[in-house]
Amino acid sequence: MKKVTAMLFSMAVGLNAVSMAAKAKASEEQETDVLLIGGGIMSATLGTYLRELEPEWSMTMVERLEGVAQESSNGWNNAGTGHSALMELNYTPQNADGSISIEKAVAINEAFQISRQFWAHQVERGVLRTPRSFINTVPHMSFVWGEDNVNFLRARYAALQQSSLFRGMRYSEDHAQIKEWAPLVMEGRDPQQKVAATRTEIGTDVNYGEITRQLIASLQKKSNFSLQLSSEVRALKRNDDNTWTVTVADLKNGTAQNIRAKFVFIGAGGAALKLLQESGIPEAKDYAGFPVGGQFLVSENPDVVNHHLAKVYGKASVGAPPMSVPHIDTRVLDGKRVVLFGPFATFSTKFLKNGSLWDLMSSTTTSNVMPMMHVGLDNFDLVKYLVSQVMLSEEDRFEALKEYYPQAKKEDWRLWQAGQRVQIIKRDAEKGGVLRLGTEVVSDQQGTIAALLGASPGASTAAPIMLDLLEKVFGDRVSSPQWQATLKAIVPSYGRKLNGDVAATERELQYTSEVLGLKYDKPQAADSTPKPQFKPQPVQKEVADIAL
């Protein structure tokens, strides 16, 4: 009994010592101009902008894991697509009269051109090195079957020809031509099946994890930048002078410190919502989050990998979220080509792949519980879809693969759990709450703290998203001649649209392709694909979209 008592006393003394050490360390404040929470591509991109705009500003980045780019930015945890709406059919919804709306597709493509310019500029500065290590040319294709879907794709193709951003896209309903583009997709397919495809040669596969690592490595070369790994934010408190005191725990030794920052960016992926709530700013009360995970089938068999060089996206079935459609993609990961098929939706209450099962519950508050309930009630089809995905068997996933790869063999594929995506739920005056696809910058009125919520298109538009953030929280500086000149050096098309300007579009694509080592041939005249005859479509209930 004495030994047990002594042991318990010793443990109590030890825990008390750790607590005292933490308090002592927390009293030693570190000061910084900018605190970046999260070691992913968003923080890395914002830090890189600010390094050029205000090189004298001090910056501190804190990351909970033992390395940067280990969550959603990691190449294995996302689809690696340079989202530019060349093939993603959910960005071109069909109107009731059968016509195709291209506004969202144009906006997505414009955004990706900004990312390309940003990366090209960093290559020229020596910040990013060896472009092939993070971006490669992979043709983007849309592929559909069935008469209705073929009619849709034909109409989509015709509509996109109105934009200078989509010049060079090709369309075919010929089995032989499509087989030449994507042999793996066509071999073994019923020759009588009605199919159609579009193909754009300038599509890309992007390793966002590699971009993140290289950007942060460059930031670390400056003495006024500090990276703290295995460091978790435990508290955020606004000070009287509108600076922030952020308590950060060292997960390795149990100590803590306070960081006093003039500006805080929460770029923590799925954890951003909880940290935004922790800040106490009133703007956070409008938001909730719902986590959805993704799985991919992966093949590294050379017989499969060498037979496929494209990202091939299909069309979602009726009642499924538009972005849920699987796609079969060439990827370049860890220096080698692989093929991924998916994603298949999974459910976990974690907000991060390396998160806690309590994440969903701990982010639910009296302010956002009702919007969450409204979203659940209003989107029964989405709930049904997620349940059906969670219930998929190995055989079900393989049958889905065979729709895109008829001659697939089970032994060539393994299942991989990718990252978590926290969907935005926002309070809505009419509906109570709505599920929003996309990303959203949330900041306080003073512009001292900002968070990025949401998931799609995410990393591929990190550069324009962070530009939006700069305009939102540093508006006066952005309008200054100094910042304007620097931003236009980083992004040559900053402040103007490429869409509708053929010469400007070709100039920027030529420039970024040369610097990034990507394929680009000046588009020829559009082919003679028959113009679609629009047919009225039955009005269907809109299905909320999600990012996987």
Swiss-Prot record:
The keyword Flavoprotein applies. Its EC number is 1.1.5.4. GO terms for biological process: tricarboxylic acid cycle. GO terms for molecular function: 2-hydroxyglutarate dehydrogenase activity; L-malate dehydrogenase (quinone) activity. It catalyses: (S)-malate + a quinone = a quinol + oxaloacetate. HAMAP family: MQO. Disulfide bonds: none annotated. Pathway: Carbohydrate metabolism; tricarboxylic acid cycle; oxaloacetate from (S)-malate (quinone route): step 1/1. Belongs to the MQO family. InterPro entries: FAD/NAD-bd_sf, MQO. Its cofactor is FAD. It is an enzyme of class 1 (oxidoreductase). Keywords: FAD, Flavoprotein, Oxidoreductase, Tricarboxylic acid cycle. This is Probable malate:quinone oxidoreductase.
